[in-house]
């Protein structure tokens, strides 16, 4: 689980664009591996997961697809991530 891999698209959903409000998140991100590319295959898999789960944002679906196979997703949004992970290959969900 450590260090966490964080796709860059997650930054858009987790940051506010304000240094003061983002300070704690930025401290956490310094401990992470930031993944800046998503392959076409992973993007297609994310689209498939969204179709199968019938819920979740594109970013959530990409996070779950990147975690395949056998990864763990850390989230504060259990419902959508678990719905997507239910169709993924051995992806577990931990709520933080």
Q: What are the residue ranges of the model-derived segments?
A:
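PIN-domain endoribonuclease scaffold, especially VapC-family toxins
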Residues: 1-71, 82-96
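Acidic beta-strand-to-loop metal/phosphate-binding motif
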Residues: 73-76
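Flexible glycine-rich beta->alpha loop in the catalytic core of nucleotide-sugar glycosyltransferases
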Residues: 79
């Amino acid at each position: 689980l450590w260090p966490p891999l964080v796709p860059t698209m997650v930054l858009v959903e987790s940051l506010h664009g304000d240094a003061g409000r983002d300070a704690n998140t930025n401290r956490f991100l310094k401990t992470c591996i930031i993944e800046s590319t998503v392959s076409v295959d992973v993007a297609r898999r994310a689209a498939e997961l969204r179709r199968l789960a019938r819920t979740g944002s594109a970013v959530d679906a990409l996070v779950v697809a990147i975690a395949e196979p056998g990864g763990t997703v850390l989230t504060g949004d259990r419902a959508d991530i678990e719905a997507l992970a239910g169709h993924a290959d051995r992806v577990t969900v931990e709520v933080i």
